[in-house]
Swiss-Prot record:
Primary gene name: metY
Catalytic activity: O-acetyl-L-homoserine + hydrogen sulfide = L-homocysteine + acetate
Lineage: Bacteria, Pseudomonadati, Spirochaetota, Spirochaetia, Leptospirales
Signal peptide positions (record): none
Origin species: Leptospira meyeri
Residues with the N6-(pyridoxal phosphate)lysine modification: K216
Protein name: O-acetyl-L-homoserine sulfhydrylase
PANTHER family with a match to the protein in the record: HOMOCYSTEINE/CYSTEINE SYNTHASE, HOMOCYSTEINE_CYSTEINE SYNTHASE
Keyword Oxidoreductase attributed: no
Activity regulation, short description: Feedback inhibited at very high concentrations of methionine or S-adenosylmethionine.
Annotated GO MF terms: cysteine synthase activity; O-acetylhomoserine sulfhydrylase activity; pyridoxal phosphate binding
Pfam families recorded: Cys_Met_Meta_PP (PF01053)
Pathway the protein takes part in: Amino-acid biosynthesis; L-methionine biosynthesis via de novo pathway; L-homocysteine from O-acetyl-L-homoserine: step 1/1
Amino acid sequence: MVGPSGESMPRNFKPETIALHGGQEPDPTTTSRAVPLYQTTSYVFKDTDHAARLFGLQEFGNIYTRLMNPTTDVLEKRVAALEGGVAALATASGQSAEMLALLNIVEAGQEIVASSSLYGGTYNLLHYTFPKLGIKVHFVDQSDPENFRKASNDKTRAFYAETLGNPKLDTLDIAAVSKVAKEVGVPLVIDNTMPSPYLVNPLKHGADIVVHSLTKFLGGHGTSIGGIIIDGGSFNWGNGKFKNFTEPDPSYHGLKFWEVFGKFEPFGGVNIAFILKARVQGLRDLGPAISPFNAWQILQGVETLPLRMERHSGNALKVAEFLQKHPKIEWVNYPGLSTDKNYATAKKYHERGLFGAIVGFEIKGGVEKAKKFIDGLELFSLLANIGDAKSLAIHPASTTHQQLTGPEQISAGVTPGFVRLSVGLENIDDILVDLEEALKNI
């Protein structure tokens, strides 16, 4: 069994099986069952003609690990299969994945419409760095999909949002925003890190491109940094708005990505124009390649993704229910609570009835009480990550979203007493005792 990118998948396997087998056949030389770690920089060509064909994109194969690697290739195929995409590109971090995905589409003088409910690092990238590259970003309230249309103009080239806003946990109506994107004629790019592909598949609901921080739930153990871009193969890059796909690329002697790879017969006639351009232009020139070792470690995490997400979700729901009843808590955000304002939308997209590991809540008394609560936790670790097997806690206003202004923080759902938990896999009784003890002392 292997995954996307032209390899046959003889049966329509379920996600639990894909997580273990996708993208791989046992190594034909060594017969190794586990995915081998190819810790190498480069690869021997058969002869000079073979090398020339590879460099000219007349044949696909390994050239240099900045562009591709056999271990990383398995990871890419496996995650693409989990998301229902045609192909994927792994990168050095989630931040580099979203950067490459957007720069593969948008050029200087063009614009992006993005949700304002974003991870702080993403907001900084779009708000501060992209304008330095000549790219303007309009931030909108995603609760009304029409806001994306209202902020669009003839320079708009992409819509960007997160499935679940981090840390606000507002659920994007993917299908509704996708409808607007299609009418405007631009791709919808979705960060699906928070729910993982086991809980939500944005491509199924109309997204065109999906990105992940592999560091989080796909890796799952807080050991390795990585990111990934998944191409749904659904977008028409030849609609007249994307000259970077339809005009000749001088660095490949006039090759036109849409013309050659928009319906690529060696891959079964699928559209791989976006993901191939991201690899052979963006990754080639900007260079944020994932290390083979990190790819190998993340693969170990992917194998247990379904099991972990079920436990994460079960524990998080119990935590949310506990906090909702506690007298020292002002309010709780968790899309799995039937009382949550996002519950109906979340239920529409979380088809398994599982809503992930992240719980947000406001402690009565504001910032000082929130800090005292976090400092009183013993089982939870205070650190800037989510998706670890261990339970984590953070105060976003003073950390992940510190560089935002007050109004920007509020727009992102970050209030002074707001705490974000990434609920781990520990015994739920131990988790609840730790929370109760910390709350007693504030």
